[in-house]
């Protein structure tokens, strides 16, 4: 079955989240290097990323901190400079070559507007928050199929994580594309399950050729 639709994860697939996590380190009053080292530990332990806050500062009240940041005027946003340099060219190349493009990851609902505001070229944009279900739940990938409007076998899902992206996408019947970048991508590239990805990339510039090879 030929691939007609390509759906992307957001964080560390299209977007470099360095600014986002540096903002959190600054808010907590810890050096960014310390915060990033702690994140690496969380990734290696295969723990949810939110546990980094408690590792850096045991007992940290994340909900209270989020409320305080909001009260101080912080709001979720994406800037064009947050995107990896290959993101926009890749999306444009896919659409110019007849693929339908979607974007959906574990993101707040505000990410949808932010993605549109920076001029992302996509046929649909969605978030786990608006759908009410997060990866790696099979229900998330059921929603991808529903919104894409085509069989799972015609969809390629691209992400930087094996646990959240590659393995559940394959279980849903999609072509699973792994990109080795960001904290999860670097660590997960060393896991045996990386062999289950249908394609492995170092850059999104390699994606269309990879799709043609597997499709």
Regions from the PLM with identified roles:
Residues 1-6, 88, 92-215:
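Asp-based, Mg2+/Mn2+-dependent phosphohydrolase catalytic module
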Residues 1-99, 108-112, 121:
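N-terminal helical cap/lid subdomain that shapes the substrate entry/recognition surface
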């Amino acid at each position: 079955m030929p691939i007609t639709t390509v759906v992307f994860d957001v964080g560390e697939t299209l977007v470099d989240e360095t600014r986002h996590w540096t903002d959190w380190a600054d808010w907590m009053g810890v050096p960014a290097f310390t915060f990033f080292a702690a994140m690496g530990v969380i990734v290696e332990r295969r723990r949810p990323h939110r546990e980094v806050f408690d590792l850096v500062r045991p007992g940290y009240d994340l909900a209270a901190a989020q409320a305080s940041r909001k009260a101080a005027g912080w709001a979720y946003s994406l800037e064009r400079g947050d995107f990896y340099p290959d993101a926009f060219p890749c999306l444009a190349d896919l659409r110019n070559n007849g693929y339908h493009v979607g974007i959906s990851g574990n993101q707040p609902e505000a990410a949808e507007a932010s993605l549109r505001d920076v001029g992302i070229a996509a046929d649909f944009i969605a978030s786990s928050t608006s759908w009410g279900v997060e990866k790696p739940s099979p229900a998330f990938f059921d929603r991808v199929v529903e919104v894409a409007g085509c069989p799972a076998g015609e969809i390629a899902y691209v992400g930087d994580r094996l646990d959240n992206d590659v393995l559940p996408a394959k279980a849903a019947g999609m072509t699973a594309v792994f990109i080795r970048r960001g904290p999860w991508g670097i660590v997960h590239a060393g896991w045996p399950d990386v062999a289950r990805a249908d394609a492995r990339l170092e850059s999104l510039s390699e994606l269309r050729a990879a799709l043609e090879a597997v499709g």
